[in-house]
C-alpha cells in the first residue's frame, strides 16, 4: 500500500482544481495543466484538499495511487511556483544564447546547435555558460534539460560539456605515461 498516496494534497489559495471523468485540470497564477488519470484511481476534492482513492485495493492500484498523487502534487506546485533546472557549460569556446524561442549552443562541434524550446518552456542564459530552464510542467522541464545536456555530455577527463548545476563529475586520471 502506498504511503505517499494516502497523504492529501493541499490546494493553495488562487489554485482551482476541476475533475471531469478521468481528467484533472489545475489552474493557477502561472498557468494551466491537464492530465489523464489512470483507470481504477479517482480523485475527490474535500474543502481545500485533494484525496486520491483506489476503486479496489491491490499492489498495482497502490502503486498507481502513489504515482497519481505525486503527479497531481507536481501539477499544483507547478502552477503556483513553477519549476526550474540549471545547467552549466564547461569548455573553451562553449557558449549558449537565447534567440526568441530557440536556444543556440556552441559546443565545440563544426556547427552550432539550434534547439527549439518546447511550448511552455522558457530558457534564460547568464554569462553565456549558465542555462536556466523554467516551466510549469516538471516532466517537460526535466526532459528539456536532459535533451540540452545530451548535446554534449560532460566527459570524465577534463569535465568539458553540459552538466546539471548540482551534478558532480567523477574525474579520471589520464594516461600514466611511459615507465
From Swiss-Prot:
Listed GO MF terms: rRNA binding; structural constituent of ribosome
Pfam families: Ribosomal_L6
InterPro entries: Ribosomal_uL6-like (IPR000702), Ribosomal_uL6-like_a/b-dom_sf (IPR036789), Ribosomal_uL6_a/b-dom (IPR020040), Ribosomal_uL6_bac-type (IPR019906), Ribosomal_uL6_CS (IPR002358)
Key words of the record: Ribonucleoprotein, Ribosomal protein, RNA-binding, rRNA-binding
One term under GO cellular component: cytosolic large ribosomal subunit
GO aspect biological process, one term: cytoplasmic translation
SUPFAM superfamilies: Ribosomal protein L6
Physiological role: This protein binds to the 23S rRNA, and is important in its secondary structure. It is located near the subunit interface in the base of the L7/L12 stalk, and near the tRNA binding site of the peptidyltransferase center.
Subunit structure: Part of the 50S ribosomal subunit.
Similarity annotation: Belongs to the universal ribosomal protein uL6 family.
PANTHER family: 60S/50S RIBOSOMAL PROTEIN L6/L9 (PTHR11655), LARGE RIBOSOMAL SUBUNIT PROTEIN UL6M (PTHR11655:SF14)
Protein name per the record: Large ribosomal subunit protein uL6
Organism: Syntrophotalea carbinolica (strain DSM 2380 / NBRC 103641 / GraBd1) (Pelobacter carbinolicus)
Gene: rplF
Amino acid at each position: 500500500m502506498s504511503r505517499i498516496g494516502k497523504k492529501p494534497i493541499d490546494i493553495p489559495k488562487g489554485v482551482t482544481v476541476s475533475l471531469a471523468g478521468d481528467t484533472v485540470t489545475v489552474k493557477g497564477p502561472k498557468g494551466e495543466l491537464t492530465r489523464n488519470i489512470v483507470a481504477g484511481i479517482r480523485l475527490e476534492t474535500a474543502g481545500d484538499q485533494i484525496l486520491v482513492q483506489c476503486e479496489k485495493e491491490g499492489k498495482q492500484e497502490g502503486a498507481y495511487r502513489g504515482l497519481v498523487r505525486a503527479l497531481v502534487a507536481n501539477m499544483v506546485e507547478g502552477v503556483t511556483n513553477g519549476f526550474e533546472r540549471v545547467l552549466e557549460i564547461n569548455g573553451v569556446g562553449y557558449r549558449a544564447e537565447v534567440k526568441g524561442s530557440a536556444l543556440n549552443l556552441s559546443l565545440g562541434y563544426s556547427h552550432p546547435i539550434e534547439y527549439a524550446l518546447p511550448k511552455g518552456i522558457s530558457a534564460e542564459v547568464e554569462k553565456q555558460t549558465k542555462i536556466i530552464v523554467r516551466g510549469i510542467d516538471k516532466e517537460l522541464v526535466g526532459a528539456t534539460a536532459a535533451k540540452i545536456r545530451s548535446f554534449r555530455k560532460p566527459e570524465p577527463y577534463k569535465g568539458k560539456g553540459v552538466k546539471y548545476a548540482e551534478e558532480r563529475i567523477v574525474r579520471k586520471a589520464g594516461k600514466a605515461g611511459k615507465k
